[in-house]
Regions:
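Hydrophobic faces of well-ordered beta-strands that scaffold small-molecule active sites
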Residues: 1, 32-34, 51, 59-62, ...
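Active-site mouth loops of central-metabolism enzymes
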Residues: 1-18, 58-66, 107-112, 160-161, ...
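Glycine/Thr-rich beta-alpha phosphate-binding loop at enzyme active sites
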Residues: 3-14, 20-40, 122-150
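Glycine-enriched alpha-helix->loop->beta-strand junction motifs that scaffold or abut catalytic
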Residues: 28-29, 54-57, 76-82, 102-106, ...
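Glycine-rich phosphate-binding active-site loops on the catalytic face of alpha/beta enzymes
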Residues: 30, 73-93, 130-139, 177-197
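Short loop-to-alpha-helix "cap/lid" segments that border enzyme active sites
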Residues: 45-56, 68, 89-96, 113-115, ...
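Catalytic cores of alpha/beta
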Residues: 66-78, 114-125, 161-183, 195-200
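C-terminal helical cap(s) of enzyme catalytic domains, especially alpha/beta-barrels
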Residues: 143-153, 189-202
Length: 202
């Protein structure tokens, strides 16, 4: 659930966030990602709180988390999963925040974009590893990022492909290597959200 992004600007400012989340849940989503960054994504922690209280499935606090206070706020707002971005943290700091979150009973999605970052996630022992198809420096997207990194996956991890997934063909191309996909913009822009969810589900 995101109203805007740095690369696209405003996406869907008038969306009823709770209704949107409930539509996701009703059509087979297993987790709902909620953007809470106010500056770049026009999100808010209250959105996470509202959605978490109105759905049964887990919610992910998708934000640029760099300290323990943010993790506490995420948990208090109802998140069961948080995002930690390898590119934004030293390996030592990543481990500190990962351990802190798991000690609080939270799951952690550890986001990577290249092989070096994937290796960091593996060394960390992250259970859930995301591959972001968007370069956070240039904002360019390429599904080949997921295809390439999938060659280096290891057993014992749950892999999620993130960003730039719009069509049934996009999803099908990832199904053999990834346990799940994170779809944001495509659903926020869709006229028929339920139909779009079914199109990208596998």
């Amino acid at each position: 659930v995101k109203k805007a992004s740095p690369s696209l600007g405003d996406i869907n400012l008038d969306v009823d966030i709770v209704q949107q989340a409930q539509t996701y849940e009703a059509n087979g989503a297993v987790m709902i990602s909620v953007l809470t960054d106010e500056v770049f994504f026009k999100g808010h922690l209250d959105y996470l709180r509202e959605i978490s209280s109105q759905v049964e499935i887990p919610t992910l606090n998708k934000d640029f988390i760099i300290d323990e206070k943010q993790i506490i706020r995420a948990r208090n707002a109802g998140a069961t999963v948080i995002l930690l971005i390898v590119a934004a943290l030293s390996e030592e700091r990543l481990k500190e925040l990962y351990d802190y979150a798991t000690e609080l009973g939270l799951e952690v999605l550890v986001e990577t974009h290249n092989l070096a970052e994937l290796e960091v996630a593996h060394r960390l022992g992250a259970e859930i590893i995301g591959v972001n198809n968007r370069n956070l420096t240039t904002f360019e997207v390429d599904l080949q990022t997921s295809v390439d990194l999938a060659q280096h996956f290891k057993k014992g991890h749950y892999y999620i492909s993130e960003s730039a997934i719009f069509t049934e063909q996009d999803a099908e191309g990832l199904a053999s290597s990834f346990n799940g996909i994170l779809v944001g913009t495509a659903l926020m822009q869709a006229e028929d959200v339920a139909q779009r969810i079914k199109a990208v589900s596998y």
